[in-house]
Amino acid sequence: MRILLAAAECAPMIKVGGMGDVVGSLPPSLIKLGHDVRVIIPGYGKLWNLLEISSEPVFRANTMGNEFSVYEAKHPIHNYIVYLVGHPTFDSGQIYGGEDEDWRFTFFASSTAEFSWNYWKPQVLHCHDWHTGMIPVWMHQDPEISTVFTIHNLKYQGPWRWKLEKMTWCPWYMHGDHTMAAAMLYADRVNAVSPTYADEIKTHEYGESLDGLLNYISGKLRGILNGIDLNEWDPNIDKVLPAQFNIKNLERRSENKIILQKEMGLEVNSKKYLLGMVSRLVDQKGVDLVLQVSKRLLAYTDSQIAILGTGDKYLESGLWQLALDYPGRFSVFLTYDDSLSRLIYGGSDAFLMPSRFEPCGISQLLAMRYGSIPIVRRVGGLVDTVLPHDPENNCGTGFCFDRFEPIDFYTALVRSWEAFRHKDSWKLLQIRAMSQEFSWQRSALEYELMYKDVCGIKEPSPDITEIEKFSYGQSADPSLKKI
């Protein structure tokens, strides 16, 4: 099949959140299944220096009263074709925000539609989040192009109908209040990025006022869990880590822990319980819970906390104050640094993800891959990926809590701290976590089934047993399943 992914991000060139990882990493797995897969993204200013781009555009056209050009490049790691939509509105390099954000992404969506009709016509146009939400509306009139729409985060829903009508001159567009609703109505298939999140968004609590619509379209809604690139994220060959390691030489992780403590200004002591967090510092991620429980945790235990990320100023200020109050025990770097994030994954003992909601989550997958035990709230993709630790039966991969309450989070933290003191069982917990299979291979098979379904292709699809071989929550090594 010819498959075109349209999105605002594509890792590693342009990445803000999990969408960038999906759009960057899913195509290689689909290509291995025999499909012609390409990606189209806005031509942000910095991309012209990062990629080898065709000197002349492969396509020019006019839409929404503006001329645009499409250039061809190659993904820097996986070498598949990436198309860049060139227009001055993208030159600043700003991805999200700004006064023209609504117009900017509606223009990108319209340009992608023109490109798909007139240059490279896919059988499936796979759109991601509200930034591409108008594409299924326009493609609905073309029987040769089927559309799939992926919900990465329902909270962000795009411009409202009155603004869309003004920008696109589509007075017939009378269904749905905004871009996200339009996409869900007109797309041939809709998926969320985890099975649990697909169920949650049909409820009032998590539906962001769209639960009624999501129940209405539930027949074409499904959940497909994200994966991670196991070659890019492999502690055994990760050159960023001072000490590479695997499940057979876990003792080497302590070298990374010591370097992490030094770099983040913490007391250097490999016996201390070190909690890490790499996150956008926003309410969704439960940073307010971290603020509420940290003083008590540091008073009761000998723990250390290392946090990396940027976000809301009031949360940044609260974390910064904790770092001032607890020097050597609490550290926060208000930036994003890929090398330091890898060191946190590969050097911390446990990883914090007390999310209010979590469509899928990538960080808990990376943490487990690198032997850092996740402490998570049982919500969204965290339910699908982190198995509760059960010391009596020697199973589980992390520590979980249910209610978004400080006492529940604190209790989970104390349980993890107590478990950490039992070194032999903690090592087995790390081995179980590191042995989980979270590759893109299973996800690609599920997407392929959905693509074939939406295109009405009747030739045999992959046997369901092939998908089960890559079942999430299962060990990559059968001999380790019962450790």
Swiss-Prot record:
NCBIfam families: glgA, PRK00654.1-3. It catalyses: [(1->4)-alpha-D-glucosyl](n) + ADP-alpha-D-glucose = [(1->4)-alpha-D-glucosyl](n+1) + ADP + H(+). Pathway: Glycan biosynthesis; glycogen biosynthesis. The gene is glgA. InterPro entries: Glyco_trans_1 (IPR001296), GS/SS (IPR011835), Starch_synth_cat_dom (IPR013534). GO terms for biological process: glycogen biosynthetic process. The keyword Oxidoreductase does not apply. Belongs to the glycosyltransferase 1 family. Bacterial/plant glycogen synthase subfamily. Its EC number is 2.4.1.21. Keywords: Glycogen biosynthesis, Glycosyltransferase, Transferase. Synthesizes alpha-1,4-glucan chains using ADP-glucose. This is Glycogen synthase. GO terms for molecular function: alpha-1,4-glucan glucosyltransferase (ADP-glucose donor) activity; alpha-1,4-glucan glucosyltransferase (UDP-glucose donor) activity. ADP-alpha-D-glucose binds at K15.
